[in-house]
Amino acid sequence: MHRRFTANDAEEDGTTQTSPDSTAPEGTVFHHANDGRPLATPWQVATERSIALADRPLAEGYIVDPACGSGLQVWAHALTLARPAIGIELDPARALASALNLRTVGEMSGGVGLPWCEGSAVLAGNGLEAEQALTTALGQASPCVAMLQLDPARPRNSRHHDLSEMRPALDGVLDAWRPWFAPHDLGPAMLLDLSPRLSADQRAQVEAMVEERWPSLRRTWVWTSRGRGRVDRLALWTGPLADDGALRRFVRIPPKMGERPFTVATHHPVEPLTITVHPPQRGEHVSLLDAALVESGLVAQWLADVTKDTDLRWGVVDGRRPQLHHPHPLRLRPEDRGLVQATGRVVALFQGSLSDDTVQDVVELAIEHRFSSLKLRLATPPERQPAWQGALDRQLNGRSGEREGFLAQHPNGHTLLLCVDAVSNP
C-alpha cells in the first residue's frame, strides 16, 4: 500500500529537519529526514538539469521518480517543465519531507494553485509497485509516464560499489515501469541519475540493461561538475532526452547563480588517454584540470580550443587532480577557467615529498623564487594539510615576493613542482 501526500495536506509531524540551501533563492528552507541533507541534490544543480530538458519533446503525462528522497530534483522538473509529477519514497519520513518540499517549491515560485503543483503528489511506499502507485496517485493505472527520473540510493563513503548495491535495483525499476510509459516515437524518456563513480565497464552494463528492454533506444551519458576536483553527477539520458547523435556530454555548473553552464558534447567515440611520464622540467607548463571533464572523455575536444600544442603529456588521468604537461600556456577564455583547477609554469623543483620535516625547506625554496603565495594542489593527509598550508601562508605573506603559485606533485611521486600561476601572473 502507498500513502498519498500533496502540497496541500502535508503536515510537519516532527520527523523531518529543515536546512537552508545556499543555491536556492534567499530564505528558502528545505525539509530532510534524518541524514537526508547530505544526499539531497543542490537546488542550483537540480534546476540547471531541468532547464536542459525544457526543449525536449516529451510525451503528454507525468514525471515519475520512484526513489525521490527529499524530492528536490523531481520538483525542479515539475516546476521548470510545468508538468505534474509523482514522487515515490519508501521511507515515510523522507516521503513527508518530499511533500513539504513540493509545497516549498510551489510557494517560492508562485506555483501554488497551478496545474503542475496541484496535480503533483508524493507516495510513501515501494517504488517498484508501479501499477499500485499509479492507482493510488491517479485513481487508475494507465501508460501515462512522460519521463522517469531515478536517483537510487548507493552505499555512502564508498569509492567503488557494484550496480547490485543500488536501491531500488536498476533492472527492477526498468522492468516495473516499462509498461507504463506514454507512447513516444523516440521511446521512453529516462534520466537515470547513477553513481558518479561508475566505471566504463559498469556504464556498459547499464547500457546493456537499457538495450535489452528497448533495442536501439537513443542515449547520452552526461557528466555534471561543480568543480572542486570531483564528478557531482553522472546520468544516462534516453529517448527524447538524449542529444541527437551525441554520445557524451559534459556540463560545468558555474559557481555564481545566474551564470549559464559550460557544455561540451561529442557525436564520436572517444579514445582513452595515455599516461606519459617524463622527467620533471623547469619551464614546462602544468595544468590540473576538471576531473569530470577528463572522466567524460571530452577533454581532448576542449583542449583543441585552448592550445595548439601537439606535445601534450598526461601525467595523471584518474582521481581529483588530472595533470597535463605542455610546452606553452593554455589560452583560456573566461568560460574555460572553471575547468582548470590550476595552471602555470614550473620554476623550481623540490626533490622529496611534503611532510612535517620538509615543509620548511619548501617555504625557503618558495621565498628564493619570489613567491608571495603558494597553494597546495596535491594529495595530503587531511589532518596535516591545514598546518602545511598555514606554514606557507604565514611565512610568504608580507615578503618581497610578487609571484602567486601552486605546489603540485610530479607523477614520479618524489618531486614537487613549484609553479607560477598563469592566471594570476599572465
Residue map of PLM features:
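SAM-dependent transferase fold signal centered on methyltransferase-like domains
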Residues: 1-426
